[in-house]
Curated annotation (Swiss-Prot):
InterPro entries: Ribosomal_bL28/bL31-like_sf, Ribosomal_bL31, Ribosomal_bL31_A, Ribosomal_bL31_sf. Coiled coil: none annotated. Belongs to the bacterial ribosomal protein bL31 family. Type A subfamily. GO terms for biological process: translation. This is Large ribosomal subunit protein bL31. It comes from Wolinella succinogenes (strain ATCC 29543 / DSM 1740 / CCUG 13145 / JCM 31913 / LMG 7466 / NCTC 11488 / FDC 602W) (Vibrio succinogenes).
Length: 67
């Protein structure tokens, strides 16, 4: 690796806005705020959230009188 061209890595405090949990990683920035993390994402927590896409399709069909 060339010297003097790579950014410096510092300990970074990452805060999940949704769950309020904090953890530390290495990054080029000292602090990050994220919307979702492994503490609150349904894939990692095991909780299922159903997204109602059928409702949106039905609204579209009603709006344009489609069957």
């Amino acid at each position: 690796m060339k010297k003097g061209i790579h950014p410096n890595y510092v300990p970074c405090k990452v805060t999940c806005v949704t769950s309020g949990k904090e953890f530390e990683v290495l990054s080029t920035k000292p602090e990050l705020r994220i919307d979702i993390s492994s503490f609150c994402h349904p894939f990692y927590t095991g909780s299922d959230k159903v997204v109602d896409t059928a409702g949106r399709v039905e609204k579209f069909k009603q709006k344009y009188n489609m069957k």
